[in-house]
Amino acid sequence: ALAVEKLILAEVRAAEVFKIIIPQGSMWMIENSNQFDNITEIIVENGGIIKIAENATLILTQASYITVMPGGSIMGKGTIYMTNSSAGFTNYNAGIIDCGLLKIDGGGSGVDFMNYGTLKLNSYRASTAGTTLTNHGTIEAVIIDGNNNTHIKNGCYLKTDKFQFGTLVMGNTSEAICKELTGNGNDNNIVMEAQSMLTCTGKANLFRTVTGPTQ
């Protein structure tokens, strides 16, 4: 539902890409579920806000994806749900995403979700093979739950209670803190680059190869 539909001021169709732009001073309230198909880019500009109510879902299917610019935000207790791995289009957050669940599943060859801002979640769940969560900002989540074929590249700060993934790469000077580092039945790797730090305050299952750090 578009509770504040008149504030969605810009819809641009170019090169077969349909763009929904939430500009400064505008808010889009999702109270139930909204689904976007084919090639749709949702852009949250500086000062724009998407609010997803509890039990509501923003669904992005096929080649649909999101771009949150610095100063933009997606807030609420609801869900962002990506199917078909955005057909290879990169999802990008340089603002704030603070919601209940970020879920990536379905077919496709995986999706890159790039975080250069703040990503706060109750749960991150990824099951599409090849999906990579790349962090150059701050990620705080209660649960990070990826299967054997999903990956995390952390270049800055990440904190979670449960930490499960296929392959983890810790970039230079990066830090990750978890309460439980779980196994997932696959001997995937953890790569620690120079001056990176991975801290587990509780149970750690290291059925995997850990390389580094060398400095």
Regions found by a protein language model. Name each.
Residues 1-215:
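Extracellular beta-strand-rich, repetitive "passenger/adhesive" scaffolds
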